[in-house]
Swiss-Prot record:
Protein name (Swiss-Prot/TrEMBL): GTP cyclohydrolase 1
Function per UniProt: GTP cyclohydrolase 1 is the first enzyme in the biosynthetic pathway leading to folic acid.
Expression across tissues: Expressed in leaves and unripe fruits.
Catalytic activity: GTP + H2O = 7,8-dihydroneopterin 3'-triphosphate + formate + H(+)
Organism this protein belongs to: Solanum lycopersicum (Tomato)
Pfam families the UniProt entry points to: GTP_cyclohydroI
Chain sites annotated for binding Zn(2+): C340, H343, C412
EC class name: hydrolase
Subunit (UniProt): Homodimer.
Organism lineage string: Eukaryota, Viridiplantae, Streptophyta, Embryophyta, Tracheophyta
Gene Ontology molecular function: any one: zinc ion binding
Alphabetical keyword list: GTP-binding, Hydrolase, Metal-binding, Nucleotide-binding, Tetrahydrobiopterin biosynthesis, Zinc
Length: 456
């Protein structure tokens, strides 16, 4: 795309209001909606089903808002935001006077991965050394970073583009950018049954510097890292992980391979509608990678194989007059992956299941319980529904007294207008005695592990 071409610094930023006016009928929106319908049909879904009838529009809106950086320009942000600062006189000091390093830390951003089209989270730290007796409004550093984040990206290219744009835009003595990035992992339906402990996130740190920061060993970097040390970043760790490391999990999990041509063509049309060139080297395999990921969640009529436990269920009820709470058992931290049917974005986390067993033994074993979680997770879903489905199914072999808690991080909560970073959603369903016994519910809920970052 040539994101650093001169033209990218000289144009008008889309107004948020004008973005909404007539949005539904804009050609780009219509093309994306048609493409999403093709993708849904490729999954075997009924595009007129109530839950996904409006999904094509929701996806189109999220994608266009999430890639609006292609139409935004740096000079429109920094122009008029450079302020004179009398303290920056000629003489000694990094900035030609008494002024020194300025860092804005912990900027939460998201971007779409150019390799697979899934959103990834970014914790951005931007620093610069002023020059010419000028400083820039601090909010502008965040806005410039957001321009380039709202494009299809890789961590290193994002860091380089933010750094170069700020160097050109405010002409400081130097700019430093450090990004801490998190990408959702890439389990597939088959491997998830074999390995239920796969990591939820792939993490990497990317760095970029210009001017006095161009030399990664310069003393000014030592100052920069010192000001970040309370943010959990070390110079050795960041430098090691920003070089030569595979970023997107789709590049190291047997993808792309052969994919449905109608679906890959649909993804190509989405790329064009967003303002990208599908023939750009980094994007050539992207449609196939995305379709391979997406097909993990196809609508399947596969019958659950419960190995006869439905027909020969062990009686797990407590004896008459016995203490129900004494027999509460649990299966905790079962890994969970799914795809939001409203925005076609992944959500993942953990599932906790409580049940009653008079002898304290799981009659079927953890692997079967985990398989139930995966079976209902690897579909287009909403968290409320999958929680209920898991509870109803495990009650067929764990007994009628069931409590299920699902904790999940939803990508749609960070990669759309709401952008609520760090949020986590918990849902629970209860059957049998758990639905009427608050003491039993409380006992189970109090036993849950601290999973404030479920799935991470």
């Amino acid at each position: 795309m040539g994101a650093l071409d001169e033209g990218h610094y000289h144009a008008e930023i889309d107004n948020e209001v004008s973005f909404e006016l007539g949005f539904e009928t804009q050609p780009e929106t219509l093309v994306i909606q048609d493409a999403v319908r093709v993708l849904l049909q490729g999954l075997g879904e009924d595009i007129n089903r109530e839950g996904i009838k409006k999904t094509p529009f929701r996806v189109a809106k999220a994608l266009r808002q999430g890639t609006r950086g292609y139409k935004q320009k740096v000079n429109d942000i920094v122009h008029g935001a450079l302020f004179p600062e009398a303290g920056l006189e000629g003489g000694s000091g990094q900035a030609g006077g008494v002024g020194g390093l300025v860092i804005v830390r912990d900027l939460d951003l998201f971007s779409y991965c150019e390799s697979c089209l899934l959103p990834f989270q970014v914790k951005c730290h931007v620093g610069y050394v002023p020059s010419g007796k000028r400083v820039v409004g601090l909010s502008k550093l965040s806005r410039v970073a957001d321009i380039f984040a709202k494009r299809l990206q890789s961590p290193q290219r994002l860091a380089d583009e933010v750094c170069t744009a700020l160097q050109h835009g405010i002409k400081p003595t130097g700019v430093a950018v450090v990004l801490q990035c998190m990408h959702i992992h890439f389990p597939n339906f088959e491997s998830a049954f074999l390995d239920s402990t796969s990591q939820g996130w792939v993490k990497i740190t990317a760095t970029s510097g210009s001017g006095v920061f161009e030399d990664g060993n310069a003393d000014v970097w030592t100052d920069f890292w010192s000001l970040l040390k309370f943010r959990g970043i070390s110079i050795d760790n960041a430098h090691r992980r920003s070089s030569g490391q595979s970023w997107c999990p789709s590049q190291s999990c047997g993808m792309p391979g052969q994919a449905n041509s109608a679906m890959t063509n649909a993804v190509n049309s989405i790329l064009k509608s967003l303002g990208e060139d599908p023939l750009r080297e980094e994007l050539v395999e992207t449609p196939s990678r995305f379709v391979k990921w997406f097909m993990n969640f196809r609508n399947s009529n596969l019958e659950m194989k419960l190995n006869g436990f439905v027909r020969s269920r062990i009686d797990t009820r407590s004896p008459q007059g016995g203490n129900f709470n004494d027999g509460i058992c649990s299966e905790l931290n079962l890994s969970f992956w799914s795809q939001c049917e409203h925005h076609l974005l992944p959500f993942q986390g953990v599932v906790h299941i409580g049940y009653h067993s008079s002898d304290g033994v799981n009659p079927v074993g953890r692997p079967l319980v985990q398989s139930v979680v995966h079976f209902y997770g690897f579909k287009l879903q909403v968290q409320e529904r999958v929680t209920r489905q898991i509870a109803e199914t495990v009650s067929s072999f764990l007994g009628e007294d069931i409590i299920v808690v699902v904790e999940a991080n939803h990508t749609c909560m960070i990669s759309r207008g709401i952008e609520k970073f760090g949020s986590n959603t918990a849902t629970f369903a209860v059957l049998g005695r758990f639905s009427t016994d608050p003491v039993a519910r409380a006992k189970f809920l109090q036993s849950l592990p601290d999973s404030g970052s479920a799935g991470r």
